[in-house]
Amino acid sequence: MAVKIRLKRMGSKKSPFYRIVVADSRSPRDGRFIETVGTYNPLKDPAEVVLKEDLVLDWLSKGAQPSDTVRNILSKEGVMKKHHEAKNVKK
């Protein structure tokens, strides 16, 4: 099962609000998901991001692939850097 971390669109017409979710890559964009790991509101200035960092790092370490947009969000929040540092630590 290929697992992705991606955005699930919420909110009403013309006012999008997104949940950052972990989902099977075969399920639809707004369909079934495994776990919610954060939210993203692009309408606020600056965009509001709330992440459960420990859950995101856990899923990344298990092999979940972030979508391009989520990868950019995680990079801005510093999560990708922490993931790469944790991955490169010698055991």
Curated annotation (Swiss-Prot):
Keywords annotated in UniProt: Ribonucleoprotein, Ribosomal protein
Domain of life: Bacteria
InterPro entries in UniProt: Ribosomal_bS16, Ribosomal_bS16_dom_sf
Ribosomal protein found in the keyword field: yes
Matches recorded under HAMAP family: Ribosomal_bS16
Statement: the UniProt record of this protein carries the keyword Aminoacyl-tRNA synthetase: no
Pfam families: Ribosomal_S16 (PF00886)
GO molecular function terms noted in the UniProt entry: structural constituent of ribosome
Gene3D superfamilies reported in the protein's UniProt record: 3.30.1320.10
Family per similarity comment: Belongs to the bacterial ribosomal protein bS16 family.
Full protein name: Small ribosomal subunit protein bS16
UniProt-listed PANTHER family: 30S RIBOSOMAL PROTEIN S16, SMALL RIBOSOMAL SUBUNIT PROTEIN BS16M
Gene that encodes the chain: rpsP
